[in-house]
Amino acid sequence: GVGAYNVAMFHLFTHAFFKALLFLGSGSVIHAFKDEQDINNMGGVWKKLPYTYALMIIGTLALTGFPFLSGFYSKDAIIEFAYLKGNTTGYYAAGIGIFTAFLTSIYSWRLIFKTFHGEYNNKEVKIEETHESPLVMLIPLVILSIGAIFAGFVFKDLFIGHGGDNYFWAESIKFLEPLSKEHPPTWFLLLTPCLVLISIPIAYYLFVKNKKLPEEIANMNRPLYKFLINKWYFDEFYDVTIIKPSKKLGLFFWKFCDG
């Protein structure tokens, strides 16, 4: 609802680099663990997979909007334009964006800490058997990491800079109203990066130093925990309201209409 379509496309563009980096990096980890995909069955292998570890750190930093990496330029731009709408909807969108950026950073570092730090938890694969991936798997990660680091800075002006609307987007995007050329206050610009930085020690404490705490918090409110862990039961709702009726409708047409 912000109307900043060029900013959204910019984030989609930068997002491609660091999200692909994390997906392929996850594949490298899965390869090292002989197809194990549960991060609860990993841990303590950052020295065994130094290149994969470093590259996934880059992807995580970019995803969370760490200052001066690609996600920092695009994600913060969306939040800034929401704030600059100057109305209740804009402030609400900016607040939700900041809060979700904070949560995103926590769960992203959860991935890193549970996968590479703490105790080794795999009973099927010995830690001596884990190994770094070959170059054929690492080179694509290196290429993507370059984009995850520099794509935001290099392409910022092209996507959302002054004049970019004229020579890059041209007539492909029609704005209902011009985007604000102002800048948010300094405190607002610093808020998201500060929360991103704060989330790192929080995630380390929760998922390395005091791993029982998340379980204790979940046990304090089991109904809410079950609701969230089951994704608001959206899959079940979708199955009941869309999938099953569609199957029955298809069966009806097959049996009684198609002959």
Would you name each region that the model predicts?
Residues 15, 42, 71, 112, ...:
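Divalent metal-coordination and catalytic microenvironments
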Residues 6, 10, 14, 92-96, ...:
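Alpha-helical transmembrane segments of multi-pass inner-membrane proteins
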